[in-house]
Amino acid sequence: MVKNIKIFLSLFFVVVLGLLATTANSMVIGIDLGSQTFKVSLIKPGAFETVLNEQSGRKTISSVGWFKDERLFSSDSFSVWARNPKQNYNLIQAFLGIKYKEGLVEEISNGLPLGFKVKNDTVRNTVSIVYDDDTNYSAEELTGMLLRRVKDMASSYAGSSIKDCAITIPPYFTQQQRQALLDAAQLAGLNVLSLIHDVNAAALSFAMDRTFLEKNESVIFYDMGARHTSVSLVEFESHNEQIKGVKKNKTVSSASVKGIEWDEKLGGFDFDMVIVNHLKTLLKKQIPSANVDDIKITIKLLKEVGKMKENLSVNQQAQIFIGSLVDDHDFQATISKQQFEELSQSLIERSLLPLKKLILSTGIKLKDIEYFEVIGGGVRIPFIQQALKDYLKRDTLDKHLNGDEAMSNGAAFYAASLTHYFKVKEIKLKDILLNSVDVEINNNIINSGGAGETLLEETEDNEDNELNNSGNEQQQQQQPTINQGGLKDKKIQLFKVNSKLGIKKTVSFSSENGFSLFLNNPTINNPLATYTVSNVPTPGEKYNFTGKPKIHCSFRLTTSGIVVLEKAEAEITVSLIKPQPQQNKTSSSTSTTKKNTTTIETTDGGSEETTDETTTKQQQQQEKEEEEEVVVVEKVIEYIQKTIRVPLNFTIKYNGCVEPLSKELSQESNDRINKLDQVDRILRELRQERNNLESFIYETKDKLESNEEYLKCSTQQERDQLVEELDKTSAWLSDALDNDNTETEEYRKQLKDIKKKADKIVNRVSQYQLVPVALEELEDTVDKVKPMFEIASKDLNVTAEELKETTDKIQSVSDWVQEKKSEFKLADYSKDLQTSSFDIKFKLYDLERTIKEILKKKKKPVKPSSSKKDKSSKSSKGKSNSTDEKDQKQKEQKEQQQQQKEESQFQNDGAEEQQFEDDHKVHDEL
């Protein structure tokens, strides 16, 4: 508990106190999309928290499926897994962005009971997941459904729609798998700011509440999830930087990933299957007729094994009991902690291999490891922890992080840092590429350049490489020239292993023709894409140049680990005519204007400018003579050389690769999911109305039988009649449940009808409860009004008759209250009361209105004394008596304050009066 509080406080100070949001809806989420469960962390102004699901759980099962044509998610889907394994889909993320092959499901499941089938999607060269004979879904669609559920859950929890997010991925995901996940997120309506390796998201969580000013720290993060194990070495460093424009320093931290290793087929599920296989052996002995390979039996065993594994973490043995596991046969068995460890020996050895590889590849010494953080559900197994301690020669393993939520917290922090509306602690994540990328250039340019011509230019992308995009660091550039032997081998290592994510590289060479660029992961033989570049400029009318154009192809390695060709340009040096300075023609123009005008005297002695035919002929003759006198000077044309870059067109093909969702396919998938969402909404409304009707029937029956108030407020005959009507409605409901065609509106109409029949008794019960309360309220008001009115009435400008009338009305209401209280005590509650709560409310309203109206009467005018009258008449001829005026104003102010004080007793009654007027209208209608 204390540890969780510390974690919460650290997140609070890191994010909440350092968080500036510019808009009301500024929110981001981090999604840890695990194979078994997913966790979601939310950052919004003033809060950094884990999103709770409908059951108030902090983690949710990653499952989607159908049962009786109804789509189900998470625990609902998981609960019917054994009953409908063919249409319940687990481990869907493992099918993202992979090619189809025979036995794929068995290979991915690794013994897990996946009951669905897959087919070959020949259009996109990937897998298609079978729903029935006529319907298939892509892995992107099913994952998109799950992510849309995540989005809706987070938006409901936050109270506002959320789109921006970061999603964790295993480090071994290929570019096709990463792109497929991005496509799935787009179908869900999410804006993925970046993907992030899950183990490195945990590293960000580690750095959020720490600084490393004293020394750099090397930390290994060991994450064993449900399906894979990954290990990362991260070096943390902090330094102080001066804030621009302010004489203050800020602390900037960095998390540099030095290496990552993994086992993509080792996780907590594998240890579960060890126990499942052991139980199958015992089951076969107990019930020889049992088919232990039956998928439904395997699923039932697997559901119980999770609890057994938890028990073995703290106890020496665990038991299992499943009733009617095989036909009518029950199954009961036990397994000890020692047996579990012995059966898992090969897995224990495998659990150390990624760690050994990491230490070997990075060259780090065990003594230099400051912390060894363990996260994920798999490391809760005691003998796994012991094996790690023995290898590391440590007495304890570090557990500073929440093993379940560190990844989602780190992803949310990462997402917030990539937005413009959050300012968080400055931590620069320097993640790395885990598989090198080569680019191969086609045969058209084998002999296009000389040795050493190809240039590989590297540029750091400040826009999305650094966690905090403060812009403090200048753009770094490296321009190493790589001798490709005149491109004879045509291959260039574009990005090597451990290249920093978020950088750009430009490949430059000379070519006269179009060409193709083939991207590939050579270490895992994974083709990525083929870019065909065209419209390379040639010398002609449009471009006046000589020689071969120099081609520049700019590739970007995104923070999500995806390589794309951003642009291709041809650099050429063209000859342009040097612009000549323009001559000043103002004087000649003025002169010409003067030549083309003549002055004609008018009869009134004025002058007028005109251009008649005679004048025009004279001007033409004069201009002709002037042109003959012009000396012809030869114009010299000068040329200048200018280097320009011409954008080139390119297309992309995925020959032999898994294709991303095209715009058209994405729209089709989105439409399919929207239709399913609409069906879900209709089913929810139908179920809600059905439940409302069913609840009303049962609750009303129960009240008629045992509720004291209902028994008082009804006769036996009325109760019997209502019960009979309820039974009829119940019979209708029973038939409707068997009829799948019953519409939502029919349930709604049945509920309305039965409520109308129950209104007589329900209203009596309501009045039985409301009348005493209303009488008490009215009596309390009268008790307060009496003394207040006696005081206030002395200063009112009212007649004695008006005063008596109001006083009598107050007393009349008081007497009426006492009369109705006595009447209520003696009333027959099985009949309608003579006085309702509306009547009492009207009395209250009428009394308050009367008091307010009389308090608005003006005060009696103060009569001035005779001496003051004399002084006043005298002062009218000169200056007024300022002292008397001042006294008079003060007295008037006091009187006004007194009046306001008296009226303030009723100043809040306006809203109540309006409400009561509305109620009274309803009462009149009734």
From Swiss-Prot:
Residues 882-904, 917-926 have a biased composition (Basic and acidic residues). GO terms for cellular component: endoplasmic reticulum chaperone complex; endoplasmic reticulum lumen. A motif (Prevents secretion from ER) lies at residues 923-926. Residues 458-485, 579-628, 857-926 are annotated as: Disordered. It comes from the Eukaryota. Probably plays a role in facilitating the assembly of multimeric protein complexes inside the ER. It is found in: Endoplasmic reticulum lumen. InterPro entries: ATPase_NBD (IPR043129), HSP70_C_sf (IPR029048), HSP70_peptide-bd_sf (IPR029047), Hsp_70_fam (IPR013126). Keywords: ATP-binding, Chaperone, Endoplasmic reticulum, Glycoprotein, Nucleotide-binding, Signal. The keyword Ribonucleoprotein does not apply. One of its GO terms (molecular function) is ATP binding. Pfam families: HSP70. It comes from Dictyostelium discoideum. This is Luminal-binding protein 1. Belongs to the heat shock protein 70 family.
